[in-house]
Amino acid sequence: MSGNNFNASNADTDHLPQVSILAQYIKDLSFENPNAPAVYQWQTQPHIEVQFNIGTQPMAQDVYEVALKVDVSAKADEGVVFHVELVYNGLFAIKNVPADQIQPFLYIEAPRILFPFVRRILADSVRDGNFPPLMLEPIDFAALYMQQTEQQDMLSNTEPAGQA
């Protein structure tokens, strides 16, 4: 047998960055079909608006909750076709990660992990309302995060006008 041993002891890995998903779950789900059954006779194509938010909060030492909040509204000339609200959460344990890397993880990687589940739940909910499944396009969470941080940097660098 070869003398190479690839088994790392706990002492060797205790200082390495570790991230794990402790749980993921629907925190809130609402599907409204206020104009059924008349809506199924409407001929106009609905306009669909999607709003997306990410929220985070610490739950315990090294444990964070990440919430993906999605609000989908479909409207036609005749009225509201359907409305879906979903809050899907993940509980993440983050250990030995540098402090400056925690926020990017919570706003980029954690949502990227949760998004496929959000997409499926929304598609199933809309389909179960007797509409074609709503298939959300993939979201570039890294680009969104960079855009948000740039906007925050610009706002913090803008000095208020003083009085003369």
Curated annotation (Swiss-Prot):
It is found in: Cytoplasm. One of its GO terms (molecular function) is unfolded protein binding. It comes from the Bacteria. One of its GO terms (biological process) is protein folding. GO terms for cellular component: cytoplasm. One of the proteins required for the normal export of preproteins out of the cell cytoplasm. It is a molecular chaperone that binds to a subset of precursor proteins, maintaining them in a translocation-competent state. It also specifically binds to its receptor SecA. This is Protein-export protein SecB. It comes from Zymomonas mobilis subsp. mobilis (strain ATCC 31821 / ZM4 / CP4). The lineage of its organism: Bacteria, Pseudomonadati, Pseudomonadota, Alphaproteobacteria, Sphingomonadales.
